[in-house]
From Swiss-Prot:
InterPro entries documented for this protein: Ribosomal_bL20 (IPR005813), RIBOSOMAL_L20_CS (IPR049946), Ribosomal_protein_bL20_C (IPR035566)
Name of the protein this chain belongs to: Large ribosomal subunit protein bL20
Lineage: Bacteria, Bacillati, Actinomycetota, Actinomycetes, Micrococcales
Organism, as annotated: Micrococcus luteus (strain ATCC 4698 / DSM 20030 / JCM 1464 / CCM 169 / CCUG 5858 / IAM 1056 / NBRC 3333 / NCIMB 9278 / NCTC 2665 / VKM Ac-2230)
Gene3D superfamilies reported in the protein's UniProt record: 6.10.160.10, Ribosomal protein L20
GO terms classed as biological process: ribosomal large subunit assembly; translation
Length: 128
């Protein structure tokens, strides 16, 4: 069996890792072992935060919808319940966009949600 020399592959692997680690401070961008360790952590953080970002955006959309719904005299909870009962299938992302960019359309959606709710839910809290 022939002897395999690894010089070319090893240098390429190390060069690639150091190129990926450029921009880090100190030894983490200059020494292979430190750079490799940092890159493994970086990949982990990257994976976690890609998934965390989805929840962050959902929270942002809910906050925007809630603010717009309260400006129209309704809470987020009742608004979403009313839309579901009315059969309106618009996701939170689009609702948040409508709330920010088109207040008149959002007011129509609030009216639709309010009409779909049972009568006792629409009554003020003091009269229940």
């Amino acid at each position: 069996m022939a002897r395999v020399k690894r010089a070319v592959n090893a240098h390429k692997k190390r060069r690639t890792m150091l190129e990926r680690a450029s921009g880090y401070r100190g030894q983490r961008s200059r020494l292979y072992r430190k750079a490799k360790e940092q890159m493994l952590h970086s990949f982990t953080y990257n994976y976690q935060h890609r998934h965390k970002r989805k929840g962050d955006f959902r929270r942002l959309w809910i906050t925007r919808i809630n603010a717009a719904a309260r400006a129209n005299g309704m809470t987020y909870n009742r608004f979403m319940q009313g839309l579901k009962l009315a059969g309106v299938e618009v996701d939170r992302r689009m609702l948040a966009e409508i709330a920010v960019s088109d207040a008149a359309t959002f007011a129509v959606l609030v009216k639709t949600a309010r009409e779909a709710l049972p009568a006792d839910v629409n009554a003020p809290a003091a009269s229940r």
